[in-house]
Amino acid sequence: MSGLSESAQLVKQALEKRGLETPMVPNQFSREEKKEKIEHHMREILSLLELDLTDDSLEETPRRIAKMYVDEVFSGLDYQNFPKITVIENKMNVSEMVRVKEITLTSTCEHHLVTIDGKAAVAYIPRGKIIGLSKINRIVRFFAQRPQVQERMTQQILVALQTLLESDDVAVTIDATHYCVKSRGVMDATSETTTTALGGIFKSNPATRAEFLHGLR
């Protein structure tokens, strides 16, 4: 894990220890090499679908997809992109719940590679450390930017924050629409999936759990 920030290393190790890391097999290709190979294979796929890649609307599509995969929608597979984290000592002795809700996220279902569109809410009880509020949103986005299942993504965000805050007292919930359900298969356009991950006092204390969940309404 040479070259990774300390925060990225700690989070990656914590997820691997708990069996929550996204299934990945490392390779030695650079970002540009990955784009070149993805572009080549995407060109083959689109040609097999009988699309005319000489058409001016389609000729750059394989390159666009390759760039999008590596630099954007799957950028969370690379821990070099893990956000820079600011954690400060809790000198103010803040002890009440900190909740961030309505965090928008766009991810990709790892089964069909179509969109997961949703919102997350995250809360924690400050102990020894406090995290910059924007960092919570960035952590959510990092784990959304990879092929995912919603249950794992919820747990990954929880463990990442527990690791960085050095506290179990974290809660995460995600409400999302899965386009593998909406645009194919059963084609249910209105259903949403909710997943929740609770740690520490959020799991052991019904009143704290209720305060978190009630605040999401």
UniProtKB/Swiss-Prot annotation:
Its EC number is 3.5.4.16. Gene3D superfamilies: 1.10.286.10, 3.30.1130.10. One of its GO terms (molecular function) is zinc ion binding. Disulfide bonds: none annotated. Transmembrane segments: none annotated. Toroid-shaped homodecamer, composed of two pentamers of five dimers. This is GTP cyclohydrolase 1. It comes from Vibrio vulnificus (strain YJ016). The lineage of its organism: Bacteria, Pseudomonadati, Pseudomonadota, Gammaproteobacteria, Vibrionales.
